[in-house]
Amino acid sequence: MESKFKFAADAVLRGKAYPALAQWSATPFSDEWRQFGYCWPYTVPCELHEHCVTHDFAFDIDTVSHIQGTDYFYTIGLGFFDFNIDYFDLVPEQVFQQGLTVLFYYHEGDNPARIKQRLDQLCYLHGLDIDCYLFVSGNTAADKIKNFAWFPDHELLYWHRNQAVPATPIHWDHRPYRFTILNRSHKWWRATVMADLDRHGVLDVSQWSYNTNVTVGDDPADNPIEIDSLELRDDVEQFMARGPYCCDDLTADQHNDHHLHVPEHYTYSYCHIVIETHFDTDQSGGAFLTEKTFKPIKHGQPFVIVGAPGTLQALRDLGYRTFDQVIDNSYDLELNNTRRWQLARNAIIDIQRQDPDAWLRICREDIIHNQQHFLATKRDRLNTLYDKLLHQLATT
């Protein structure tokens, strides 16, 4: 029997489901359609619908008022999860009357355990069964939580948005830089990483960027790396004072445009040091993969990932290879944030000591495998998610 999602929506316009609970008014394919995430209650067009279209995964979609049966998901795409919003108070009463399952779809890495606690509180407040909803999260810890499921949305999102850009041809000639290191926005742990790499001479052999002007309200006190234990406070302050740093001609907005591509970021260096979005994923114990990781995979580079513990294992679970034969990836197992960074830094320094051309040749088979694996259809990812959700429903 063919797997098929059944989605319920408040309205369907020109084949697109109108974002659930939304107060903002817009029509598909307009500039306003991209503004939902900035307007209360910050629900957005559900990317899961688009992934099904892109990868030819069967689905039905209809309005709540027209559907028959209870085997439909009332999908709520979240721009971000706001703990001050009572989501169930906004859900149409007909959804609960018809026995539909509310499906939250959230591609960010916030701690899913905290989200579950909040949603369960709201269920109790409204007299709802806590099994009335399922939640899809970009945090791998979700797979360990009842009614939650992990899905690597950013893999499919980058696959789709960068689809018009051919994968960068892999070459084996000499390259002018050892590493590529890109930072579009400032966080204090990222500045700590970059200052430490600078102190060890890694930036001297790298093409790299760090935009000190784009900030996200990060508090220095929340730095998960113990900056004073590494005696880096002065180095970080000096590093920030000299910024911003760039290695291309793109603007900050263009750096965040997944449709754009700078081939030299991948062809001019041997290894990509990925500075991920989160280093400790909101104290969740999970990992969070974004387009930052999938860019070097698509465009043919080995990588070291400066991110949460278990990030490399999450990639392996998705079928990717992590160059264990030439990189000491033990850092991925370290739970202590400061120690994990030290181990990752040591792995980077060890790569720098190698003959770069010989090192790259050893990586050849895995580079090619990763690129081809990324370019393949992601229909299997959707099927895995479908099975996860049905299993959750069957065990409620």
Predicted regions: what is each one?
Residues 2-274, 280-290, 294-299, 303-396:
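Pol beta-like nucleotidyltransferase catalytic core
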